[in-house]
């Protein structure tokens, strides 16, 4: 498998077709299941879905309606980007994208018809000075504290277009991948030293908004459900513990 999770209300309406996989397993049999197991040690199953994340992002836009928002997420999370665009349209905000992988993935998603761009929402990053702070949102790479990513350059004051100011609100719509914690903390520290407010998933109780990230990997109960349905002769966990 690749990365997977069970989603009751996916943004694109395409659910994990476990019924079809079960049919194949019953008819042909599964000799070996090589399953990505990144979150297999996390108890239970997901208690919220991507629509909940979108709702939380909308809450942030409403709560900080006079502030410039900078949202960092994984560039491969097309559904997350779709949610940000939808909420930005609702809030009357313009959206710019920054980061090579972010722009590349967005272009591929557009060509594949995997994302819908609301009319008159996307602008160029260099045009941010044309809009009031409360009407501008930047979506960028760097949620893992990568040294050369857009967000880290902002945190160090080295970005040529965006200089962090004390009215900015930076949102991490992500979790730190194990091993990246110190890099994320370094970026957060830099952003706060530059003067911005930082909102991180898992710490949203400090701001009153809901969850800002949903893992793309199944939890323990999800793995049990998949293995039980496919009933392979052999099982090999990969890409995890």
Q: What is each residue range found by the language model?
A:
Residues 1-130, 149-163, 182-184:
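His/Asp/Glu-rich metal-coordinating catalytic cores
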Residues 85-86, 90, 109-241:
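C-terminal regulatory/interaction regions
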